[in-house]
Amino acid sequence: MNKLIDIPILYLSSYIIENKAEYYKLLNRTNTTGEWEDWILFILKAIEKTAIKTIEKISSIRKSLDATIEKVQLNAPKIYRKELVELLFEQPYAKIDFVVNQLQVERKAASRYLKELERIGILKSQKIGRETLYINIELVEILKL
C-alpha cells in the first residue's frame, strides 16, 4: 500500500457540476472580455474544496482499514493477514483470483478467506455471471460520499 497513486484523486467535475452556472458565466467572461482573474479564483476554490473533501475521504478510508484489521483479528484470527485486509481496500470489491494472485495462496484458501470475511460482515458477495464478487461494504459507502 506504500505505492504512489497512479490516477488522479482530485475530481473537480463534481464541484463544477454543482456550480455549473457560475462556472460557465466566468468562463464565458474570459472569452468575451479577457478577464481571467475571477475564473482562476473559481478554479482555485474548486481545488481547495475538492482537496478538503478528498482528505476527509482518505481519512475515513484509513479509519475503516484500521477498524477492519481489528475486526478480522478479533473475529477471524485464523485467516488474519494484514496483506489480505489491505487488498480489500485497493478497490471496492475482491475476487478469488485477486486473492490468489496477490497473496500467492491456493484458490480454496482464497475462497475460504473471502467467505469468512463475508460471515463476519466485512464483505457482501454478489454473483455476476459465473463469478462471485465480494464487495467491501464500508469502503463502498465511503466512496459514495
Regions found by a protein language model. Give the residues of each.
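Phosphate/pyrophosphate-binding active-site loops
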Residues: M1-I58
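Short alpha-helical segments that sit at the start of domains
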Residues: I55-L87
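Short acidic, hydrophobic short linear motifs in intrinsically disordered regions
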Residues: Y80-V85, E90-L103
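Basic amphipathic alpha-helical segments that dock to polyanions
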Residues: L88, A110, L114-I120, Y134
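Active-site lining segments that contact anionic ligands and/or coordinate catalytic metals
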Residues: Y93, I120, E131
